[in-house]
């Protein structure tokens, strides 16, 4: 009898162990281990993602001023986009381009989160979430969660939506050569605003929307929806990131000139335009507060993967610069966070 009890007890214990192991495996199947150096949180302010759709290893690099880097590698391909989870968050999100997944960094693992379709973009505002999905080649599905009006709804727009934003009254979504305006109260699309040419980014103030369209700057007055197209400088090759600076009341556009150099266009409150050559190579730029961060890839110098220059948008002076280390894959995107 005692022997049977012991045998039964061991059997129950074994079953419990097996169930626990299965539970852990199921729970961790979406966790991808990260190999990293010692992490210094005070340095984790600028994050760079190196990735390639055909190589199953990406690198997440972080630093503060480029004096020292924290390096994380993980077995995931095709994550060319990095952003923070929301406008006020420091949590990082990595977005795949062709696969229905996004990834979050959690201590020593990268968490994989499945989606119904690949993201076109993900916007997390103060009281609005916009999730845009690449459903097929004929259109994008837009999911809107408006926490102010307590409404959730879905819209379908033509393909190539790239960015969304919101203010107290409206939601704005840019798609190729148009900006769609959605009334937050009625959930209706009230305007389709034509851009001067293709654009994938815009910025807005209380009064204006400014899109960095290819051939001319598009300026739209909110409410009246009056649109003005402003000629760029003759040396412009590619208009990129656009930003509204509340402190100065000016809009800024980072652009590449015909020689591959970085430039800054300032569109002032008085509708004046000034341009400044920053004497730095250009691939991509991000604004944060009164600072402009510019990244350029390096193709030929061994050991160097790229260059970073940090500029004050008011003085137009370079504050510092540093080299990025070379990796097996190229740097694709970066984000700047506030750890204050």
Swiss-Prot record:
Q: Where in the cell is it found?
A: Cell membrane
A single GO CC term for this protein reads: plasma membrane
Q: Name the membrane topology term.
A: Single-pass membrane protein
Taxonomically, the superkingdom here is Bacteria
Question: Membrane-crossing residues?
Answer: 6-26
UniProt entry keywords in alphabetical sequence: Cell membrane, Membrane, Transmembrane, Transmembrane helix
Predominantly, its location class is membrane
Q: Does the keyword Cell membrane apply?
A: yes
Q: What is this protein's name?
A: Uncharacterized protein YeeG
- The source organism is Bacillus subtilis (strain 168)
Give the taxonomic lineage as stored in the record: Bacteria, Bacillati, Bacillota, Bacilli, Bacillales
């Amino acid at each position: 009898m005692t022997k049977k009890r012991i045998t039964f007890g061991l059997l129950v214990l074994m079953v419990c162990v097996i169930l626990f192991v299965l539970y852990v495996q199921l729970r961790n199947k979406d966790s991808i281990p990260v190999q990293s150096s010692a992490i210094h949180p005070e340095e984790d302010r600028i994050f760079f993602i190196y990735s390639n759709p055909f190589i199953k290893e990406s690198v997440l690099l972080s630093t503060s001023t480029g004096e020292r880097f924290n390096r994380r590698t993980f077995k995931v391909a095709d994550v060319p986009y990095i952003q923070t989870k929301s406008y006020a968050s420091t949590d990082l999100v990595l977005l795949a381009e062709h696969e229905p997944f996004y990834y979050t960094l959690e201590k020593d693992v990268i968490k994989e989160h499945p989606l119904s379709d690949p993201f076109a973009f993900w916007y997390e505002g103060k009281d609005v979430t916009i999730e845009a999905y690449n459903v097929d080649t004929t259109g994008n599905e837009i999911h809107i969660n408006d926490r102010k009006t307590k409404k959730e709804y879905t819209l379908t727009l033509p393909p190539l939506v790239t960015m969304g934003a919101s203010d107290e009254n409206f939601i704005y979504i840019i798609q190729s050569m148009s900006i769609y305006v959605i009334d937050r109260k009625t959930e209706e699309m009230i305007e389709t605003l034509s851009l001067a040419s293709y654009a994938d980014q815009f910025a807005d103030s209380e009064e204006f929307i400014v899109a960095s369209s290819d051939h001319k700057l598009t300026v739209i007055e909110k409410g009246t929806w009056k649109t003005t197209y402003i000629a760029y400088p003759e040396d412009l090759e590619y208009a990129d990131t656009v930003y509204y600076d509340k402190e100065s009341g000016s809009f800024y556009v980072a652009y590449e000139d015909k020689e591959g150099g970085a430039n800054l266009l300032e569109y002032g409150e008085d509708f004046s335009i000034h341009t400044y050559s920053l004497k730095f190579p250009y691939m991509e730029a991000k604004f944060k507060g009164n600072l402009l961060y510019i990244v350029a890839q390096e193709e030929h110098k061994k050991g160097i993967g790229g260059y970073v220059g940090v500029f004050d948008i008011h003085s137009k002076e370079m504050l510092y610069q540093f080299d990025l280390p070379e990796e097996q894959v190229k740097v694709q995107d970066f984000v700047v966070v506030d750890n204050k």
